[in-house]
């Protein structure tokens, strides 16, 4: 289990994140929302250990994250950053197979997992193609498959951190991606996903953290958090919130 206590992160001598207390729960998708500059990517950086905590601590299975070896950490924690740079002409399946490097499961099992992750991210049809020949959205889905393969099939004790995994995707693949993430959590993994689309968060997330100015504004179920008052306070946006006629989750409509 991944949790943070009173997390503060500094950049350039100023706090970009302050007062964060958070626990990722097995089987849960936690969505992180907020305007640009709210601290969403800084939160992911602090949780993953990429950014050092100026104050507070990050704990993985009740042990400070910094005390884990790289390989042991990678077997429990996978991170998909906002931008994943790769300048080599690897085939798609080779990129996804990079997620298996921390493991010692053997070639046959690794190939099975890579194929399963390719299918989950809807990129199996791209196998054999050069990564460099792909569109931005295709590359994003290949990297999703890579981090899924790293923790496949997802189970309690696994933690997946995703920074805007739908940003380059068309509407269909936004849902395909979040359905894959939802299925991963349903098998027991804890997932944190940064999103900008309020309605995607309402549909796929169990809890939502609303950030404002690097601090937590609201944390709770989508029904509790995605209300007109908090959304006006954080985004400056006037909205109507209705119940989805078929699924029952909040449906947010800009006025």
Curated annotation (Swiss-Prot):
Q: Does the keyword NAD apply?
A: no
Q: Which UniProt keywords apply?
A: ATP-binding, Cell inner membrane, Cell membrane, Membrane, Nucleotide-binding, Translocase, Transport
Chain residues that bind ATP? 34-41
Q: How does it sit in the membrane?
A: Peripheral membrane protein
Localization: Cell inner membrane
Recorded GO cellular component terms are:
plasma membrane
Q: What is its EC number?
A: 7.6.2.-
Checking InterPro entries in the record gives: AAA+_ATPase, ABC_transporter-like_ATP-bd, P-loop_NTPase
According to its UniProt entry, the function of this protein is described as: Part of the ABC transporter complex HmuTUV involved in hemin import. Responsible for energy coupling to the transport system.
Name of the protein: Hemin import ATP-binding protein HmuV
Species name for this entry? Pseudomonas fluorescens (strain ATCC BAA-477 / NRRL B-23932 / Pf-5)
Q: What are the top taxonomic ranks of the organism? A: Bacteria, Pseudomonadati, Pseudomonadota, Gammaproteobacteria, Pseudomonadales
């Amino acid at each position: 289990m991944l949790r943070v206590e009173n997390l503060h992160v500094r950049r350039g001598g100023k706090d970009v994140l302050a007062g964060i207390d958070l626990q990722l729960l097995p089987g849960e998708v936690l969505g992180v929302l907020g305007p640009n500059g709210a601290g969403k990517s800084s939160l992911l950086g602090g949780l993953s250990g990429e950014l050092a905590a100026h104050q507070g601590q990050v704990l993985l299975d009740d042990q400070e994250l910094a005390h884990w070896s790289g390989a042991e950490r990678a077997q429990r924690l996978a991170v998909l950053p906002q931008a994943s740079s790769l300048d080599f002409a690897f085939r798609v399946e080779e990129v996804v197979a990079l997620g298996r490097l921390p493991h010692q499961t053997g070639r046959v099992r690794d190939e099975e997992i890579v194929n399963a992750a390719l299918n989950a991210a809807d990129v199996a049809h791209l196998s054999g193609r050069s990564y460099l020949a792909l569109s931005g959205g295709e590359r994003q889905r290949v990297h999703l498959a890579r981090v899924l393969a790293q923790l496949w099939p997802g189970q309690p004790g696994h933690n997946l951190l995703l920074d805007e995994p739908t940003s380059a995707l068309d509407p269909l693949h936004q849902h395909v991606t979040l359905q894959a993430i939802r299925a991963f959590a349903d098998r027991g993994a804890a997932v944190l996903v940064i999103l900008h689309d309020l309605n995607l968060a309402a549909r796929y997330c169990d809890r939502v953290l609303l950030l404002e100015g690097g601090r937590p504004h609201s944390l709770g179920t989508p029904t509790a958090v995605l209300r007109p008052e908090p959304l006006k306070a954080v985004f400056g946006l006037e909205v109507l919130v209705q119940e989805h006629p078929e699924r029952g989750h909040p449906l947010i409509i800009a006025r």
